[in-house]
């Protein structure tokens, strides 16, 4: 019986030692230690290779991109709309179709006067204002029926046509910008295609509703356009053209702050504005000169031809005059507030704000510094020296000029001549 029972523990030990079939070849100590080491090696080396084939795609990189791109590119719009950003600057990469982004907004990198090749041949700058802002009811901003032709809207793009149109067409709204797509954005929709100039008519591109007004008679009254573009604002009473373009320009400038005219060469109202600006400039210049003369107590006879000198030189001249008037009573008491004297060379008036030199040698006449040819440096030195005496060429040419003088306060004075 003991012989039969002895193999049983050996069988149990072999089953307990490990799962490998080679465990029975060694002793019990070897059977307990070696199978664990073999399992550790199998756990570190074996699973390292199967995950590469189970989870990773095939080693071909093209197949990797296909696996990653197919769920996205085939089901969405990236493949079909990828070439659009390069050809269409108005669309973003993630906007399907031609929707909201490109219809009413202008991207900052696009020129503001470029017409859209997809959303109609008119400009998109003023598109967010669908209702009229004009008191005459004509401020419809580029309706879809107001087309001039194909892309870039080259009709009236030539400046010569713009100039001719500004001379031949009389329009109530005369504050257009010089833009090929915006010259006729606010023309009343009556008198369609009535242009008296055949050259202009030959250059029109036929559109759906090209509305142009011909040179109207002086007594022709303006009728507001009908509500054909879905405008919610009722048309105001009619206004006669004989009221002139000035009132219309004023109304338009007050009613259209963003539509103020920045180009001064578009139409007749610009010419009138130029004339007004010139008149204002002339008036400002006259008022400026009159105020200056009033400040200086000078008669406004318009004989002043010399440019005015800087304020520092004028102050120095005034200082010189005041000093010398106090030093020399025989100078007839001239000061900065007394009337001016004529120049001894150019016979024009010598103002107090000009560089002037007094001939103290003999003739006691005033001379412009520019007329005498004296430089500013020499004039500054002469002005800084209170006891210096300057003589004109005529006085210095005479032999009877007293070259030596004796001053009561300052002693012998320096004799200066500018011949």
Curated annotation (Swiss-Prot):
Residues 373-391 are annotated as: Interaction with BCL9. InterPro entries: Wnt_Signal_Transd_Protein, Zinc_finger_PHD-type_CS, Znf_FYVE_PHD, Znf_PHD, Znf_PHD-finger, Znf_RING/FYVE/PHD. CDD domains: PHD_PYGO1. One of its GO terms (molecular function) is histone H3K4me3 reader activity. One of its GO terms (biological process) is positive regulation of transcription by RNA polymerase II. Residues 341-388 are annotated as: Interaction with H3K4me2. It is found in: Nucleus. This is Pygopus homolog 1. Residues 18-30 have a biased composition (Gly residues). One of its GO terms (cellular component) is nucleoplasm. Interacts with BCL9 via The PHD-type zinc finger motiv, and thereby becomes part of the nuclear beta-catenin/TCF complex. Identified in a complex with BCL9L, CDC73, CTNNB1 and PYGO1. Interacts with histone H3 mono-, di- or tri-methylated at 'Lys4' (H3K4me1, H3K4me2, H3K4me3); the interaction is enhanced by the interaction with BCL9. Involved in signal transduction through the Wnt pathway. Residues 276-286 have a biased composition (Low complexity). Changing residue 354 to A: Reduces interaction with H3K4me2. Residues 175-221, 240-255, 287-307 have a biased composition (Polar residues). Residues 1-64, 175-338 are annotated as: Disordered. Pfam families: PHD. PROSITE patterns: ZF_PHD_1 (PS01359), ZF_PHD_2 (PS50016).
């Amino acid at each position: 019986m003991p012989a039969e029972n002895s193999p049983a523990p050996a069988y149990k030990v072999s089953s307990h030692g490990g799962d490998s079939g080679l465990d029975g070849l060694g002793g019990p100590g070897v059977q307990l230690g070696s199978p664990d080491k073999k399992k550790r090696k199998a756990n570190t080396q074996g699973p390292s290779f199967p995950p590469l084939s189970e989870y990773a795609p095939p080693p071909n990189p093209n197949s990797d991109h296909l696996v990653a791109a197919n769920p996205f590119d085939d089901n969405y719009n990236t493949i079909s709309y990828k070439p659009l950003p390069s050809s269409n600057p108005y669309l973003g990469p993630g906007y399907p179709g031609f929707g909201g982004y490109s219809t009413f907004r202008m991207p900052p990198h696009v020129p503001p006067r470029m017409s859209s090749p997809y959303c109609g041949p008119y400009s998109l700058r003023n598109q967010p204002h669908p209702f009229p802002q004009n008191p005459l009811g004509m401020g419809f901003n580029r309706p879809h029926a107001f087309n001039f032709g194909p892309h870039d809207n080259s009709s009236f793009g030539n400046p010569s046509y713009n100039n001719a149109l500004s001379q031949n067409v009389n329009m109530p709204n005369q504050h257009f910008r010089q833009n090929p797509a915006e010259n006729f954005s606010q023309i009343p929709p009556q008198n369609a295609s009535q242009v008296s100039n055949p050259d202009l008519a030959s250059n029109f591109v036929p559109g759906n509703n090209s509305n142009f007004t011909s040179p109207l008679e002086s007594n022709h009254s303006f009728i507001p356009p009908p509500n054909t573009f879905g405008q919610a604002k009722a048309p105001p009473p009619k206004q006669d053209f004989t009221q002139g373009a000035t009132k219309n320009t004023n109304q338009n400038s007050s009613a259209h702050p963003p539509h103020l005219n920045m180009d001064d060469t578009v139409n007749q109202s610009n010419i009138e504005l130029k004339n007004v600006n010139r008149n204002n400039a002339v008036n400002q210049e006259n008022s400026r000169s009159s105020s200056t003369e009033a400040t200086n107590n000078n008669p406004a006879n318009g004989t002043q031809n010399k440019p005015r000198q800087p304020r520092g030189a004028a102050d120095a001249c005034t200082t010189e005059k005041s000093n010398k008037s106090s030093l020399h009573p025989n100078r007839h008491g001239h000061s900065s507030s007394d009337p001016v004297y004529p120049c001894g060379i150019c016979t024009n008036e010598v103002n107090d704000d000009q560089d002037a030199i007094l001939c103290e040698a003999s003739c006691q006449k005033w001379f412009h510094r520019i007329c005498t040819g004296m430089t500013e440096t020499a004039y500054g030195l002469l002005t800084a020296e209170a006891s210096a005496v300057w003589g004109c060429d005529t006085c210095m040419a005479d032999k009877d000029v007293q070259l030596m003088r004796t001053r009561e306060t300052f002693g012998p004075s320096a004799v200066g001549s500018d011949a």
